[in-house]
């Protein structure tokens, strides 16, 4: 591979994409200028698949959407001003969705690298596309595919997806626990559920890692957007009518950066993405394919309260991000105890479960370790901004800490005592109440009949 100079790249190309029904393998091909092709593969287990008529056309539409969204991993290496699609045409609605994903989903990447990406990524639009060109037949929107009533539920190994899986089980929804990639931790968690599983393969183009070694731009991408597109493709291929994630309402709020404004590390876990993506899927891919987050009405603390109701997964789950880097070491234990995710999950669970149970899960008491003060200050938004991690809002951390400060078994721990002495006196008592943060919100895409079955359980 010739030397890569990101400043000399002028164009990013979506070269082509294809899906082989006999093997279940999707190939997503990209390139910079006239450089070597970069091919990512996604493998849906269960081949061969019988795909014809409307379903085959829907697979093609889902494949193109995945091709466009997954390209973010490669585009970011050089962020050139020109973009082309070599092998198919898209309309304005598709371009608008994907451009929104790139701009917002690369927000943290742009901030950390000092880049301004506003209006930079623009897709070529072909208007108008006829219903036949879209693969809709003669309809005004995507057809109903008569998909089987069955949910593909994303599992990430943490508490959130396990709450969703158990809620769907209790509601009588047929579900398959689904994950992407080779994490053994996630596999163990998935197997612990006792439900059918689907492990989708994803292999990034090896050239991408070489570009990174040669000085490409690198950083955070909207991975939930990519995983959502992968699972929509899998659902259409498998003939299932629901793709379920476990993103709570706290994900919609980012970090407030002085002089910059809001930067949301988890934008593609937020409501704006879920709404836009879910509506697009139903209008353009399959009318009866529902994409939604089961936990959208809940705060992080409300999810923690639900998780604490059972200890069935205590020895299996982990939200520690050090377990999930593409490259790099994994900790020997499931919780490193020093990253923002460990800090937040410990704090969020503390009000809702016995102290000894929580310490047993983590292997130690994180709130009785003075060296963790800086990490907790960031969660509390005390002299720092919320970390660029998938953690709850500052007000949730403050309310949880205030709750612990009032409890005999916690109030003598060094960081709880520090909060009570140093931080709590600067805050109003009203904003430290935990109960208002447990109230269910009305903004979600959960199918109405399912929500009626879930609502009472989530409120308690």
Question: Residue spans of the language-model regions?
Answer:
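ATP/NTP-dependent adenylation/nucleotidyl-transfer catalytic domains that generate, transfer
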Residues: 1-30, 37, 287, 308-460
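Hydrophobic/small residue at the entry helix of a nucleotide-binding pocket
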Residues: 160
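Short helix-capping/linker segments at secondary-structure and domain boundaries
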Residues: 73-85, 235-243, 349-360, 406-411
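Glycine-biased, low-complexity coil/linker segments
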Residues: 133-137
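Class I SAM-dependent methyltransferase "Motif I" SAM/SAH-binding loop
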Residues: 155-156
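RNA-binding accessory domains that recognize and position tRNA/RNA substrates
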Residues: 1-128, 142-150, 167-205, 217, ...
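ATP-dependent adenylate-handling ligase core
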Residues: 181-315, 319, 331
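Long, compositionally biased low-complexity repeat segments characteristic
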Residues: 127-132, 460
């Amino acid at each position: 591979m010739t030397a890569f100079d990101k400043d000399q790249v002028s164009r990013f190309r979506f070269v082509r994409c294809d899906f082989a029904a006999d093997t279940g393998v999707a190939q997503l091909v990209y390139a910079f200028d006239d450089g070597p092709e970069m091919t990512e593969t996604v493998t849906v287990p269960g081949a061969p698949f019988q795909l014809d008529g409307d379903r085959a056309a829907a697979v093609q539409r889902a494949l193109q959407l995945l091709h466009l969204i997954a390209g973010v991993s490669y585009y970011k290496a050089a962020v050139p001003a020109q973009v082309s699609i070599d092998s198919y045409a898209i309309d304005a609605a598709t371009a608008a969705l994907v451009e929104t994903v790139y701009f917002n989903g690369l927000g943290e990447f742009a901030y950390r690298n000092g880049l301004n990406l506003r209006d930079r990524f623009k897709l070529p639009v072909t208007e108008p596309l006829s219903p036949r060109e879209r693969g809709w037949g003669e309809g005004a929107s995507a057809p109903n595919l008569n998909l089987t009533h069955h949910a593909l539920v994303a599992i990430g190994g943490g508490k959130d997806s396990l709450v969703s899986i158990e809620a769907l089980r209790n509601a009588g929804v047929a579900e398959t626990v689904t994950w992407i990639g080779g994490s053994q931790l996630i596999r163990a968690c998935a197997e612990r559920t006792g439900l059918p599983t689907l492990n989708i393969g994803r292999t990034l183009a090896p050239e991408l890692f070489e570009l990174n070694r040669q000085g490409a731009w690198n950083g955070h991408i909207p991975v939930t957007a990519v995983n959502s597109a992968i699972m929509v493709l899998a659902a259409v291929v498998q003939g299932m009518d629901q793709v379920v994630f476990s993103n709570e309402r706290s994900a919609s709020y980012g970090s407030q950066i002085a002089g910059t404004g809001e930067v949301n590390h988890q934008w593609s876990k937020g409501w704006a993405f879920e709404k836009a993506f879910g509506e697009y899927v139903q209008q353009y891919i399959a009318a009866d394919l529902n994409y939604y987050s089961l936990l959208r009405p809940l705060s992080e603390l409300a999810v923690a309260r639900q998780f604490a109701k059972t200890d069935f997964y205590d020895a299996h789950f982990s939200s520690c991000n050090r377990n999930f880097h593409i490259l790099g070491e994994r900790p020997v234990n499931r919780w490193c105890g020093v990253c923002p995710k460990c800090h937040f999950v410990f704090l969020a669970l503390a009000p809702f479960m016995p102290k000894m149970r929580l310490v047993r899960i983590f292997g130690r008491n994180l709130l009785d370790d003075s060296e963790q003060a800086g990490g907790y200050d960031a969660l509390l938004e005390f002299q720092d901004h919320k970390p660029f991690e998938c953690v709850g809002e500052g007000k949730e951390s403050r309310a949880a800490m205030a709750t612990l400060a009032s409890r005999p078994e916690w109030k003598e721990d060094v960081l709880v005592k520090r909060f009570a002495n140093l931080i709590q006196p600067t805050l109003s008592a009203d904003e430290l109440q935990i109960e208002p943060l447990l109230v269910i919100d009305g903004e979600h895409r959960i199918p109405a009949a399912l929500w009626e079955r879930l609502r009472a359980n989530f409120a308690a």
